[in-house]
Structures are given as structure tokens and as C-alpha cells.
């Protein structure tokens, strides 16, 4: 890895420019990325109508995600009716993509479209989409898949604008990987494809130019800018090692899509804000195309409104903020250059580790890749349960008055099981949402009452903390400015019929206040003390057992109280 670092440091400041190897600053001398949106194809005719509409609304890169298992040449003609192929980039994903690719190639050959005017991508990805997600190739050891890929690469040799393979890097991110893992594993899968294609007789140039990378962008703003910059540099060096005649094949062709891992199903409009900062990261770093995930994707099929907002984020970044007018504005920023360097180093280390195991396929088969991602996901889950990591609207600052609508189903908040050596996408907020949905649908309306007393400033601070704490489970919080006496507070608490009463005061007040509340309250409600006062052992000795504070595992603690209330 020190070699990679030296390479990077040498290349970093030597008047590095966009469009010049190793492409840290971009593969082109401009930053005109394409605005990408996905249309789900159940019925080709309906999908065509949606496509024409969004193409008129500023989209210049369209993805057709094909759902039906059978798809004919006639279906393809219906789907592409009135779409001028040279005017737009088209991507095909979903079921039977290799079969669809055959149909597409036949169509463009029949229509004799000039090769340089065709810009088409296929999301064929047996290594990540099949092997890593499903646990196996479509056929024994994948021989069939790779023969098919080789056939498509041969057929599209003259079409520089057709990319056959898309490395689905978002699968790692959306299963909970770290930024470094997502990059290293994507590079390793890309390298595996290169090696396989060269083994099948293709040159490095022919192989590299058929590979497209797709990456998820999370809300970790600066790290994501650095990831995309580091990725270009590392991929350029990987391809360069095979001595291509020119540098052009060393350019990483990258599509970015905003993350689904951090999307929340409660308070979903916050997802619009996440998508915005993520789109900014991608457009500052420079990508070929960018898709902002519609804000409601977590719980329903995107609709006209959510798709329009998603497009408008990018249209605004271009037409109002002019992000497309500047290339790599982050270049030369000490902070971002250093981050790029450290991500490049860490990702290169991990890439080398995979190569030492025999490449991506071997590393996957040994369990290394999936175990790595699952360990990262488990660490993130713990961070979210304990609020080391924040997901707005889920584990912090929830919308107090929100009740789940009928569009929010149990399926939307249930984490998919990833059997054995496979990765399944999930969302970081699912555990909180499943708990809250259970409360929303329980037919009960549990309440938590804030008994604020003692010193006013501390009482308010503790009440604010406690309200946010209990509201995360959909428990109705009753906040109170301040009670002059504990008797007055307990009387109001009993009148509210709240199942939980939270004493909110300063640490010094608790030794006296908490036992008094307990005495007056009896067993008519669950008593909770907000904080971790020094007198905790004495209070526990008096039977006061419940404390919430910044060290609490919010998720487990809330589940405990729900159980106590019989919900």
C-alpha cells in the first residue's frame, strides 16, 4: 500500500488535470453529467409513456428495469417507440438482461444506427448481482454467463458507446458496507471481469471499455467525494498494469445512485434532503451519470411526484447552482486531497488482500467478502441503536405527531434475511421502524409524561432528550414546562393516564426528587429517571430501576418499555 501512496502523492500535485491519467480529477475536461432515472417496466406500453414524459422533463439517461420473465423484440419496439436512440443514453436492467441485450443489438443493427451515436449500457453482473446476492451464478460455475458476456462483447466491438457489464457497487453499500469496502470490492469485481475477458482472448482495451461501474452515494459528504476520486485513480492504475496502447481504456466509467441504506420510511420527506447532499457529492466529484433515488422508494413504487422532485434536484444543481460548469472544484483542497489519499490507500490494501486470495470469485467463495460486509453492517446497526450514528426521523428527532399511513407495510420495515454467503440490501432504520409500526398498529396509544421539576434549565434539557427518546417508538409524549412541586407533577401525571412517567431534573435534585415521585406514584405507572446521576446506586437500592441517558441503547431500551406495557 505504501507504493500506492507514493504513486498517489507523486501524481497528486504534479499539475494533475481532469482528463489526464490517472484521472483523479475526472476522466473528461468537462463535468456535464447525465440525469438518470429508472422506469420500472411491467407493461412496455405504459413504461414507454412514462419514458417519453420524463425525457421531456430533463432526463437524458433512462434506465428500463424489466420485470417480466418473457420479453420479445415486439415488446422492445413498443418500449422504445418514439424514443430517438442517438439523443439519449439507455440502460437495461432487471430480468434476463443478456437476452434483452441480444434484442437491442439486433434492433440497432437493423436500423443501421451510426455506431458513434449509440450510448447503451447493460446491467449484466454475474459476480455481484448473481453470485454475491443470490449465492450462485445462473449456471454451474458461471460458464454460461461468461460465454454470453464474451459473445456480447464481440458483437459490440464496433460500438464504443455500448457497455455490457455494470459492476453493481451499490449492492455492497446498501447491504451496510463501509465506503472503503464498497470501493475495494467493486474494483476487485471489475478486475475479475477484466481478467476473465482477457483469458477469453480479448485485449485489455476491448475488455476495459465494456465495463461500467455503479456506486451508491451515502450522506457522508466529503468521504463520498473522495471515494469517487480515489476510485478513478485506482482503476486507472489497475488497467494501466496491463499496458494498454493508450491511456483511454484506463478511464473509469461511473454511474452514481443515491443510497437507499439511509432512507427512512417514517418522516420520508427527509429523504429528499439526503438525496440532495448525496447528489452534490457525486456532482462535485464528477460522474458520468447520476440517479437521485425517489424519496418514497423505501415503502412504495416511485410516483410522478417523487420522480419529479428527484429530477429537479439535479436540474437545480445544473441550472441554478451551475455544478456542471466546473470540473473537480474539490481538487487542491487539503482536506479532500488527504481523504482521497487515505481512501485510496485503504481501498488498495483491501483490493490487494482480495487479489492475494485469488481474486473476487475466490474471495467470495471463501466467505471473506460477505463476512466483511456483514460485520460492518452489524457495527452500523449497533451505532444506530445507540445513536453513535444518527438517522433523522428514526433514531433521533422523530416527527412526534406522525402515524404510519396505510402505504407503510410491515414488509417495508422488515429486514430481508440474507441466507448463508449472500448479501441482501436493507435500510439502517428498519429496526426502529418495525418497532414504531408495531406500536402504531397495536390499537393502543401509549403515553410518556414528562415530570419536570427541580432546576428549570436542567429539567427542560432532560425533557427534550426524553421526548425525543420515547417518540422514536411512536409513544405519545406529554411535555410540561415545569412543575413547582412534585405533588403537583404527580397529580398531573396520574390525570394524564400515562403509562410512563419520566422525572426530569438535575443530577443533584434526583436523590430527593426521584424517591418522592416513586412514593406518590406507586405502581400506577412505570417510573423512569432521565440521566445517570451519581446517586444511581442509592436510587436503585430504593427500587428505582429505570434510567435513560446518552449511553442507553435506545432501541433495546424502548423495546423493554413496550414489553413492560404489554405492547
Regions found by a protein language model. Name each.
Residues 3-8:
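Short, small-residue-biased leader/transition segments that mark boundaries at the very start
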Amino acid at each position: 500500500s505504501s507504493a500506492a501512496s507514493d504513486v498517489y502523492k507523486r501524481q497528486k500535485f504534479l499539475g494533475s488535470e481532469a482528463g489526464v491519467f490517472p484521472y483523479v480529477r475526472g476522466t473528461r475536461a468537462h463535468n456535464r453529467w447525465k440525469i438518470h432515472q429508472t422506469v420500472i417496466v411491467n407493461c412496455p406500453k405504459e413504461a414507454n409513456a412514462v419514458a417519453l414524459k420524463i425525457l421531456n422533463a430533463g432526463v437524458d439517461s433512462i434506465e428500463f428495469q424489466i420485470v417480466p420473465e418473457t420479453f420479445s423484440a415486439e415488446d422492445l419496439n413498443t418500449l422504445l417507440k418514439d424514443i430517438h436512440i442517438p439523443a439519449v443514453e439507455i440502460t437495461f436492467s432487471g430480468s434476463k438482461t443478456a437476452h434483452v441485450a441480444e434484442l437491442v443489438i439486433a434492433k440497432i443493427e437493423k436500423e443501421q444506427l451510426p455506431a458513434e451515436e449509440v450510448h447503451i449500457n447493460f446491467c449484466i453482473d454475474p459476480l455481484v448481482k448473481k453470485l454475491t446476492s443470490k449465492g450462485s451464478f445462473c449456471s454451474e460455475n458461471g460458464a454460461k454467463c461468461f460465454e454470453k458476456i464474451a459473445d456480447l462483447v464481440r458483437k459490440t466491438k464496433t460500438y464504443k458507446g455500448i457497455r455490457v457489464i455494470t459492476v453493481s457497487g451499490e449492492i455492497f453499500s446498501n447491504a451496510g458496507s463501509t465506503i472503503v469496502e464498497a470501493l475495494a470490492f467493486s474494483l476487485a469485481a471489475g478486475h475479475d471481469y477484466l481478467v476473465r475477458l482477457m483469458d477469453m482472448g480479448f485485449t485489455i482495451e476491448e475488455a476495459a471499455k465494456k465495463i461500467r461501474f455503479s456506486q451508491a452515494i451515502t450522506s457522508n459528504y466529503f468521504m463520498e467525494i473522495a471515494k469517487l476520486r480515489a476510485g478513478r485513480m485506482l482503476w486507472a492504475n489497475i488497467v494501466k498494469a496491463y499496458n494498454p496502447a493508450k491511456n483511454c481504456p484506463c478511464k473509469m466509467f461511473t454511474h452514481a445512485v443515491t443510497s437507499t441504506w439511509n432512507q427512512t420510511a417514517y418522516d420520508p420527506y427527509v429523504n429528499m434532503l439526503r438525496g440532495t447532499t448525496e447528489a452534490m457529492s457525486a456532482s462535485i466529484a464528477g460522474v458520468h451519470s447520476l440517479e437521485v433515488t425517489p424519496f418514497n422508494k423505501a415503502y412504495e413504487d416511485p410516483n410522478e411526484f417523487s420522480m419529479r422532485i428527484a429530477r429537479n434536484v439535479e436540474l437545480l444543481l445544473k441550472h441554478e447552482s451551475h455544478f456542471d460548469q466546473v470540473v473537480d472544484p474539490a481538487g487542491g483542497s487539503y482536506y479532500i486531497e488527504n481523504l482521497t489519499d487515505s481512501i485510496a490507500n485503504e481501498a488498495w490494501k483491501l483490493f490487494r488482500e482480495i487479489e492475494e486470495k485469488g481474486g473476487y470469485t475466490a474471495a467470495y467463495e471463501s466467505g471473506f467478502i460477505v463476512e466483511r460486509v456483514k460485520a460492518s453492517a452489524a457495527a452500523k446497526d449497533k451505532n444506530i441503536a445507540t445513536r453513535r450514528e444518527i438517522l433523522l426521523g428514526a433514531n433521533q428527532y422523530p416527527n412526534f405527531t406522525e402515524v404510519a399511513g396505510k402505504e407503510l407495510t410491515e414488509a417495508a420495515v422488515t429486514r430481508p434475511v440474507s441466507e448463508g454467503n449472500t448479501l441482501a440490501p436493507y435500510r439502517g432504520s428498519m429496526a426502529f421502524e418495525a418497532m414504531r409500526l408495531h406500536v402504531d398498529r397495536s390499537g393502543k396509544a401509549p403515553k410518556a409524561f414528562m415530570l419536570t421539576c427541580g432546576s428549570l434549565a436542567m429539567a427542560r434539557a432532560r425533557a427534550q432528550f426524553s421526548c425525543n427518546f420515547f417518540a422514536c417508538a411512536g409513544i405519545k409524549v406529554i411535555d410540561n414546562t415545569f412543575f413547582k412541586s412534585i405533588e403537583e407533577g404527580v397529580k398531573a401525571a396520574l390525570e394524564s393516564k400515562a403509562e410512563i412517567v419520566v422525572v426530569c431534573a438535575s443530577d443533584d435534585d434526583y436523590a430527593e426528587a426521584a424517591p418522592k415521585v416513586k412514593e406518590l406514584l406507586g405502581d400506577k405507572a412505570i417510573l423512569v429517571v432521565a440521566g445517570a446521576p451519581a446517586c444511581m446506586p442509592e436510587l436503585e437500592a430504593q427500587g428505582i430501576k429505570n434510567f435513560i441517558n446518552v449511553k442507553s441503547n435506545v432501541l433495546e431500551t424502548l423495546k423493554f418499555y413496550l414489553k413492560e406495557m404489554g405492547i
